[in-house]
Structure formats: structure tokens, C-alpha cells
Amino acid sequence: MVDRVAALCNYNVLEVVFSYLDLNDLGRCSQVCKSWFHFLNDENSDVWRFHCLNKLPKEVTKSELLSPVPTYKTKLRAFFHSWNPSDCSRNVYIKPNGFTLHRNPVAQSTDAARAKIGFRHGRHAWEVIWEGPLGTVAVIGISTKEAALQCHGYVALLGSDDQSWGWNLVENHLLHNGDMQGGYPLLNNAPKYQVGERIRVILDCDDNTLSFEKNYEFLGVAFRGLPDKKLFPTVSAVYGNTEVSMVYCGTPLDG
């Protein structure tokens, strides 16, 4: 009985202490001992709940948007990987939920946005949801920090140079270095994207490939031979008042 009370007290003390630490310190704490590791390994613990609700609006934590990330810890991680309000076109702003960009209705402009965190190692997956009209061009993919985020006219900005790779959802074309790299997916009469569908983007920095999934169906490798550079989730849009959400999911599950 005494041991159980002591264990409960220890749990409560850790919960309070860890709630006041920043996230970098929590990472270090998980490496101190097995007990702390197991404590922090509970992704729905009150510690992760506290930090999650401290960063994210409560309504978004319960929304369908974050359904791919069911735990408090994964929701928090997704927030830190979401759109970067300091790395987007001047005609784009990030909504208060942190996960959705809004393109202002500016004529003769194509506008893009990048995520806060890029990748150079490992395998990563994120979901993109176009929540408004696509317009004449709507591109999802990746870019380096050197890729442009705004240009004149209505064009496929993402994929227009050697620093970006994209899939134009309107025409089902792959784009890189200003050239069309072929149709995608490689299906006869491939269905067009429908507003609200979730596209899962899979970046494999070990194999240097970029792939896509839709409705849990793997669509095949879109790009190979990606450079050994930090690559960021990116989209470019042309339609006024359209909105695009992005949710980082972590390491993709095989099969």
C-alpha cells in the first residue's frame, strides 16, 4: 500500500514538473531513466494534454482536420510542422488554427507557402486538404528554401524551377524545373481531385523519392533522385479566398 501511494505521489509530482518544462527539456528528460521515458511515452498523458492545449486552440484539437494525429503529442508535433507564417507569399495568411492557409483574392498572382520544418533525413508523411476551389492551377509538393513563393500571373509556381517539385491537381501533371514530367497518377482516365479530399504526401529522404496517396491508395512514386537538401512541404495556389490545410503525420506506415 505504501509503495502504491509513493508511486502515485511520484506520478503526480512528475506531472506537475513536466508541465512547466519546455518541449526541448521534455525530450532530454525522456533520456534520463526508464521511468521517465515510460511516463513521457504516454502520448495522451496530462503532460502532453497541457502542452497541446497551451499551444493549439481547443476547438482544433477536437476537429476532423486533426483526425490523422489522434494523440495530444502527435497533434502538438503536427502544429510545430504546420505552415510557416514567415515563409509564405505576402498574399497568403495563416488562419488562427495554425494549420490552414488562406489566399487573398489578388488578381494576376500565384502564391505559395512552405511549412515550418524541412527534412533531409528519414521518411515523412503529411496530409494536404484543399478546402476551396482549385482554380486553373493548384500544386502540392516540396521545395527548398530557395524556391520562389510569389510570381505574376496564374502559373504552376511550385515546380517552375530546379528548387521545387509539384503535382498539379487540376491537370494531373508532375512539374519540375519548369517542365511537365508526365501525367500522374499513371492510370487511364485518372480521376481528378475533388475539393476536400485528403492527399497524403510521402517524402523518403533515404531513397530520395516523393510519392502520393489518395483515399488510402498508393499512387506510385512521383519523383526520384531528389537532392541532398532540406526539403519543405509546399503548395502554390491561384484562386482567391481558397484555403489549404496541412497536417504532419510523422513516419509513414508501410503497407
From Swiss-Prot:
The keyword NADP does not apply. It is found in: Synapse. Its main location: other. One of its GO terms (cellular component) is neuromuscular junction. Pathway: Protein modification; protein ubiquitination. Gene3D superfamilies: 1.20.1280.50, 2.60.120.920. InterPro entries: B30.2/SPRY (IPR001870), B30.2/SPRY_sf (IPR043136), ConA-like_dom_sf (IPR013320), F-box-like_dom_sf (IPR036047), F-box_dom (IPR001810), FBXO45-Fsn/SPSB_families (IPR050672), SPRY_dom (IPR003877), SPRY_FBXO45 (IPR035784). Residues 61-253 form the B30.2/SPRY domain. It comes from the Eukaryota. Residues 3-51 form the F-box domain. CDD domains: SPRY_Fbox. GO terms for biological process: negative regulation of gene expression; negative regulation of synaptic assembly at neuromuscular junction; neuromuscular synaptic transmission; positive regulation of protein catabolic process; proteasome-mediated ubiquitin-dependent protein catabolic process; protein ubiquitination; synapse assembly involved in innervation. SUPFAM superfamilies: Concanavalin A-like lectins/glucanases, F-box domain. Keywords: Neurogenesis, Synapse, Ubl conjugation pathway. Belongs to the FBXO45/Fsn family. Required in the presynaptic motoneuron to down-regulate the levels of wnd and restrain synaptic terminal growth at the neuromuscular junction (NMJ). Component of an E3 ubiquitin ligase complex composed of hiw and Fsn. This is F-box/SPRY domain-containing protein 1. It comes from Drosophila persimilis (Fruit fly).
